[in-house]
Regions:
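Amphipathic, Lys/Arg-enriched alpha-helical "gate/interface" segment within cytosolic domains
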Residues: 1-158
């Protein structure tokens, strides 16, 4: 079985404050962490690696319902990815109602030449369609995993 054939149903991490799912060639992370620390970031990355089997996938969805990583934690995450031999996702998306966060992802995509697009929470179905273009995963599967992740975290996806 190749890594892209793997499906990991939404699984809780960080004592129920975060979820991870892998749908073939798309990963999904949803977190409701009120305050990230470097230790939590590393625990999250290691937990995702253990559950996901250490496979780099070409597309990734991130949803931060609580606080998102700060600049130092994004750097820590990037360095951890490189040090552990993973390839960064070629297509990334984030759901946030913050214009600042969405604008930051746009700027990031320009600087890194990464295919990246941010969506408002109300546009989560459009995000599912966008992230799976030319992928094995389907928009229906990504949306279902997103909905289950929200439920596991005690949230409702509207």
């Amino acid at each position: 079985m190749t890594g892209f054939q793997k499906v990991v149903k939404p699984t809780l991490l960080l004592n129920g404050k975060a979820c991870f799912a892998q749908l073939h060639d798309v990963t999904l992370i949803v977190s409701d962490v009120p305050k990230w620390t470097n230790e939590l970031v590393l625990e999250y990355l290691n937990g995702m690696t253990k559950i996901g089997g250490g496979v780099s996938v070409p597309a990734s969805v991130a949803v931060f319902l609580g606080e998102s990583f700060d600049a130092g934690q994004r750097k820590l995450s990037t360095e951890w990815i490189e040090e552990n031999g993973f390839q960064p996702a070629k297509r990334i998306t984030m759901i946030s109602d913050s214009l600042l966060i969405r604008g930051s992802l746009t700027a990031y995509s320009w600087l890194t030449k990464t295919e990246a697009k941010a969506f408002a929470m109300k546009d989560h179905k459009a995000m599912c369609d966008w992230i799976v273009r030319e992928r094995i995963a389907t928009a229906t599967d990504v949306h279902e995993a997103l909905s289950i992740s929200f439920h596991l975290l005690g949230k409702k996806l509207l």
